């Protein structure tokens, strides 16, 4: 297979990934592949571009490094071109409502007829099968959070609250990435492709699993947080200092002992309620839990963030300032690791945002291209799979493809 023009880099160089999906969840999987060196083709509707394009800045991050193909993949010669593309594709990711592709005639079996080794990842809110009530419903971030039991665990004691921004979309996209790579490993070993059914609500069910296990195996459900503090453990969560907020985790024998000395509770160490060797203070079961919180709140309120960070570093207590977004790019850790970077958009502007992650030592990812325009690479992609100029123009004239103006 000849590849589209792009630099060779990253651990996934030589891999061809194609995705069909809008907004965040499915495309986030494509973004990860593209930043790790894969050749990633983004399929868009011919008549209507991906709705993410209406956003002023985010698409420049989420669609960088991609090749843009505008093709009607469900109709006539457009479908034929799509199936031809699948012959040279390693991973195909689609995000839609339930078994939408199968309903329109593009089943796993049809795809495998054209490429027996193809890895297919289906991403939807409720899965490819189940009950009629749910399977074909649309779903976004908050829907998946609400249906999974994840949302009800977040927020404050007074009201549940979704975790933002768009947590379920990103977790689901990462799940598609890792699952597809696992399936690809097996497909290359056996020569047989795989179909992966990723339900967003099941992804979030796993993300919310920690406290659910207490309910499933005893009937007790953890309460929600109070003003950002851990619902179970004292000294864990969000706290206010004299000049702003920190998060901390008071965990460990020595850490508790030294912290108690600082906040005036050393006399409680070694008592039946807080025996020697205590590693966590349960705010509910320990009768001194509320007192620990009261003393800690008072001590933190009397000290600046810098003072708290310095002292907690001495005591090996995990803690961090709650950074504002404007503080990120000047933070020395961000600067040292180049966590924020810049790249050029297709129209020559400079865009700033998060860098490629994680950092591969021997085969690093990179940003080589900004977001392509609607249909920008259609002609190049179709030529790559054997279409002539006349073939491409015929697809365009029939409204089955769009090329860059």
Swiss-Prot record:
Write out the entry's keywords from A to Z: Cytoplasm, Transferase
Active site at 169 (nucleophile)
Residues at which CoA binds: 97, 104
Q: Which domain of life is it from?
A: Bacteria
Q: Give the primary localization class.
A: cytoplasm
Q: Which Gene3D superfamilies match?
A: Crotonobetainyl-coa:carnitine coa-transferase, domain 1, formyl-coa transferase, domain 3
GO cellular component assignments: cytoplasm
A GO BP entry: carnitine metabolic process
Q: Where in the cell is it found?
A: Cytoplasm
Cystines in this chain: none
Q: Which reaction does it catalyse?
A: crotonobetainyl-CoA + (R)-carnitine = crotonobetaine + (R)-carnitinyl-CoA; 4-(trimethylamino)butanoyl-CoA + (R)-carnitine = (R)-carnitinyl-CoA + 4-(trimethylamino)butanoate
On assembly, the entry states:
Homodimer.
Q: What does this protein do?
A: Catalyzes the reversible transfer of the CoA moiety from gamma-butyrobetainyl-CoA to L-carnitine to generate L-carnitinyl-CoA and gamma-butyrobetaine. Is also able to catalyze the reversible transfer of the CoA moiety from gamma-butyrobetainyl-CoA or L-carnitinyl-CoA to crotonobetaine to generate crotonobetainyl-CoA.
Give the protein family.
Belongs to the CoA-transferase III family. CaiB subfamily.
Check the record and name the NCBIfam families matching this protein.
PRK03525.1 (NF002914)
Cross-referenced PANTHER family: L-CARNITINE COA-TRANSFERASE (PTHR48228:SF6), SUCCINYL-COA--D-CITRAMALATE COA-TRANSFERASE (PTHR48228)
| Protein name per Swiss-Prot or TrEMBL | L-carnitine CoA-transferase
Species assigned in the record: Escherichia coli O17:K52:H18 (strain UMN026 / ExPEC)
Q: Which gene encodes it?
A: caiB
């Amino acid at each position: 297979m000849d590849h589209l023009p792009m630099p060779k880099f990253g651990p996934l160089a030589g891999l061809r990934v194609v995705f069909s999906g809008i907004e965040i969840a499915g495309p986030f999987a494509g973004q990860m592949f593209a930043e790790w060196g894969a050749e990633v083709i983004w399929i868009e509707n011919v008549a209507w571009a991906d709705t993410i394009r209406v956003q002023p800045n985010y698409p420049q991050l989420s669609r960088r490094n991609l090749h843009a193909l505008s093709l009607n993949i469900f109709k006539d010669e457009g479908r034929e071109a799509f199936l031809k593309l699948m012959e040279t594709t390693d991973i195909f990711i689609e995000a839609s409502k339930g078994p939408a592709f199968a309903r329109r005639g593009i089943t796993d079996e049809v795809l495998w007829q054209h490429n027996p080794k193809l890895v297919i990842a289906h991403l939807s809110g409720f899965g490819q099968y189940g009950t009629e009530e749910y399977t074909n419903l649309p779903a976004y971030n908050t829907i998946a959070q609400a249906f999974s039991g994840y949302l009800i665990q977040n927020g404050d004691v007074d009201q549940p609250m979704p975790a933002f921004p768009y947590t379920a979309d990103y977790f689901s996209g990462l799940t598609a990435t890792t699952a597809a790579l696992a399936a690809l490993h097996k497909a290359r070993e056996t020569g047989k492709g795989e179909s992966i059914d990723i339900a967003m609500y099941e992804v979030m069910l796993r993300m919310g699993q920690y406290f659910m296990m207490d309910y499933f195996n005893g009937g007790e459900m953890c309460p929600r947080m109070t003003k950002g503090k851990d619902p179970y453990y004292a000294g864990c969560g969000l706290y206010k200092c004299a000049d702003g907020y920190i998060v901390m985790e008071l965990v460990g024998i020595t850490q508790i002992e030294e912290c108690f000395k600082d906040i005036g509770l050393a006399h409680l160490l070694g008592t039946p309620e807080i025996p020697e060797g205590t590693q966590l203070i349960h705010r509910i079961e320990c009768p001194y839990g509320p007192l620990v919180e009261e003393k800690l709140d008072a001590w933190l309120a009397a000290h600046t963030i810098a003072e708290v960070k310095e002292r907690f570093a001495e005591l090996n207590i995990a803690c961090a300032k709650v950074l504002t977004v404007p503080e990120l790019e000047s933070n020395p850790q961000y600067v040292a690791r180049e966590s924020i970077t810049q790249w050029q958009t297709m129209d020559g502007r400079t865009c700033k945002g998060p860098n490629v992650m994680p950092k591969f030592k021997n085969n690093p990812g990179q940003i080589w291209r900004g977001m392509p325009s609607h249909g920008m690479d259609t002609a190049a992609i179709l030529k790559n799979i054997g279409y002539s100029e006349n073939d491409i123009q015929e697809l365009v004239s029939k409204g089955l493809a769009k090329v860059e103006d």
